Design a protein with these regions (language model features):
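Short, Lys/Arg-enriched, disordered terminal segments
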Residues: 1-2
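Aromatic- and Gly/Pro-rich donor/ligand-binding loops
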Residues: 5-14, 18-137
Length: 137
C-alpha cells in the first residue's frame, strides 16, 4: 500500500513540522507494510512568503550574530524536515494521481485556511475526487 500525506510540509514552523512528523509516524505504525511519503506539493507563493518572513533582517532587533544563528537554526530545521520521505515534486492533481497512491491523507487543519497565503483548491481534494482520500484536523 502507498500512502501520501498532503500538507504544508515546506513551512518552516515547528507546529507544521510536528503535525507532519506525527501523522507520518502514526501511519507507519497503523500500516507497517505501507510505503508512507509526504506528497511534495509546494505552493511557491506560500513558501516564498514564509521563507522571507524567517530570513528578513529586523533592524534594532537582529544583530549580525543573531541573524547568523537564525540561518543556522533554519539549516538544522530543514535537515530534520527532510528526514521524512517525500515524493518527486508535483504541481497538479494529475501529477498526484500519477503517483499511484492507494490513499491520500489531507491535513492538518491549516491547509484549509481560506485567508492564508497557502490556500489552494488542491488541498481541499479538488481534482482528486476519484482517489481514496481522508482528511484530518
Amino acid at each position: 500500500m502507498k500512502i501520501g500525506i498532503l500538507t504544508h510540509h515546506y513551512v518552516k514552523n515547528y507546529g507544521a513540522f510536528l503535525q507532519m512528523k506525527g501523522m507520518y509516524e502514526t501511519l507507519q505504525r497503523l500500516y507497517p507494510e505501507a510505503e508512507v511519503t509526504v506528497i511534495n506539493y509546494v505552493n511557491q507563493k506560500h513558501w516564498r512568503r514564509n521563507i522571507l518572513h524567517i530570513l528578513h533582517f529586523r533592524p534594532g532587533i537582529d544583530t549580525l550574530s543573531t541573524y547568523v544563528e537564525k540561518i543556522r537554526q533554519l539549516r538544522t530545521f530543514t535537515k530534520y524536515e527532510r528526514s521524512i520521505p517525500r515524493t518527486r515534486p508535483v504541481k497538479t492533481a494529475k501529477e498526484i494521481i500519477d503517483l499511484k497512491l492507494d490513499l491520500i491523507v489531507l491535513g492538518s487543519d491549516e491547509i484549509w485556511n481560506l485567508c492564508g497565503s497557502g490556500y489552494h483548491p488542491l488541498k481541499f481534494g479538488t481534482g482528486l475526487e476519484n482517489q481514496r482520500t481522508i482528511a484530518y484536523a
